[in-house]
Amino acid sequence: MKKILYPHQSDWSELLKRPTQDVSTLFENVSAILKNVKANGDKAVMEYEEQFDHVKLESLAVTSEEMKEAEAQVPIELKVAILLAQRNIYTFHKKQKFEGRKVETMEGVTCWQKAVGIEKVGLYVPGGTAPLFSTVLMLAVPAKIAGCKEIVLCTPPNKEGKVHPAILYAAQVAGVSKIFKAGGVQAIGAMAYGTESVPKVYKIFGPGNQYVMVAKQMVALHEVAIDMPAGPSEVEVIADETANPKFVAADLLSQAEHGVDSQVVLVTTSQKLLEEVEYEVQHQLARLPRWQIAEKSLENSKLILVKDMEEAIGLTNQYAPEHLIVETKDYMEVAEKVVNAGCEGGA
């Protein structure tokens, strides 16, 4: 991680630059895959699964037998954790549900507003080196609360043609209607256009690599709505001398291991804490299963020492991080002054 001490405000813009991605060269390849999926349906999707995920599939749909098998394979401790997470996510999002309102704008004129769940939604859950069952819950639980009648999930299988059991169990717990073994651009195309197996949906949600992001943006031009364009994941931690350096380092690494293009930033008023966090990051990094990914993303990351908390807040509002963690003595006061955070620049 790069260490920056007392940067001048005029240098903040340069200092806070995010890792850039040139996706212009991807459009031709992504467009060709989407066109093939639109024209040839399941056949094209399975061909791309063989090409990119190195698996020969007989069908795309996850069967009820596979769901039962997955449930039996998930350890009881993980089941308990998934159920607890589902309950917490449900409780939080249930409170957000819009019940509608009526307003009489003038005598005899009443306007009203109501929220209706999208009938069919598609959820994309990436594969890779770690099963993102938390993503399943965070996408599917709100969809269920909103009243979506059909929740379709696509996720890439492994080389044996299996989806990770934890993903299937989380999907079952969250109320997903149908699950398909498809990843990447071909999965986005299948949900956007519909195939013999995969239903056409009205809106697609979920993270993915740069190919998935380009595919989502391309299908959004004509076929289907999407949540939003997304970039690499990021987190900023604001901390003072009262913060626990082990916790701060763990918070930074938890985001750094998302991908090699992730970015993590510590902004602190304490040089002692900065140095302790720098040590802890290296100490904890060595014990991470995904240490190589985290180590690469730390090349994009920064430890920044500022003169006071007002400067920390100003820098934060200019950076507008996707995720922000405040670890200070007066955390509520600091949080109240942050106006630009939770801006989904990342996935």
Q: Which ranges hold each PLM region?
A:
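Short acidic-hydrophobic, aromatic-tinged amphipathic segments that line or gate anion-handling sites
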Residues: 1-7, 178-183, 303-308
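Conserved small-residue-rich beta-alpha loop and adjacent elements
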Residues: 103-169
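Glycine-rich phosphate/diphosphate-binding loop of Rossmann-like nucleotide-binding domains
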Residues: 145-162, 240-247, 251-289
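N-terminal Rossmann-like NAD(P)+-binding subdomain of aldehyde/semialdehyde dehydrogenases
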Residues: 1-119
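C-terminal core of ALDH-fold dehydrogenases
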Residues: 318-347
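Conserved NAD(P)+-binding/catalytic subdomain of aldehyde/semialdehyde dehydrogenases
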Residues: 175-263
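Short loop-to-beta-strand entry elements in the cores of soluble alpha/beta enzymes
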Residues: 205-207, 228-239, 254-278, 294-304, ...
